[in-house]
Amino acid sequence: MKFIVIGLGYFGSTLAISLTEQGHEVIGIDNKYERVDELKNQIGNVMEMDTTNENAVKTLPLNDTDAVIVAIGEDVGSSILTLSILKKLQVKNIIGRIISPMHKSILNQIGIGNTVHPESETAMMISLQLQVKNALKITEIDSDNVIVEFKVPQKYVSHTLETANLDSRFHLKTVAIKTLEKKGLLTREHISTTLSPSDSYIFKENDVIVVAGLLENMKKFAIEQ
């Protein structure tokens, strides 16, 4: 997979190095030469750039990357402007780092709904989530195994767990299935959880499936979706 990480402070550099070590193609960008020079041997490609300059940003391979992560934390203004430029250039998968509720609100207003909050999520876990497409949540069991929550693929809706055959096809264990139950007009929505569901379970619209297994197998399942 290919990623661009903009902003190589502690969070951004940790994320970029983690992705590089896992064999992904990474372009790391910072506006400080000192940071670029310090990280040149730890990240696949690293460059100095002012990403608030639209013409400079246009030189990046934006359409040939799986995600662009704006990890700028010190300068909120630069973060917002950089994200606005990426949005204007119609980059498909943009992830913005947020540092406050107000920052998140502004990003939502400019159409950046995919955000991360490093103070509550580690760079390693965000690295995992970037690798497993469509994952709603990832919990690391050990260096090889994870538990992942996915929205059930549309093609599985109205079909049984046995038909999906995740165990044989992907060597993944279905731990639980979460179902959103909509109540009446005056009552709230409720999420019910089915632990260790039977093979006869029939998937419903908006179900969330919780599966456990090797990270590599999760990636294969995610690609199929």
Predicted regions and their residues:
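A generic structural signal for short beta-strands and their flanking turns/coil linkers
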Residues: 92, 112, 144-146, 170-173
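Glycine-rich adenosine-cofactor-binding loop
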Residues: 4-19, 152-157
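Cofactor-binding loop segments of dinucleotide-utilizing enzymes, especially the Rossmann-like FAD-
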Residues: 8, 31, 99, 179, ...
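Cytosolic ligand/metal-binding cores
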Residues: 11, 15-16, 20-27, 31-132, ...
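Cytosolic Rossmann-like ligand/nucleotide-binding regulatory domains
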Residues: 2, 160-225
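Short, flexible, solvent-exposed loop/turn segments with mixed acidic/basic and small polar residues
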Residues: 136-141, 198-201
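Extended boundary segments
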Residues: 138-169
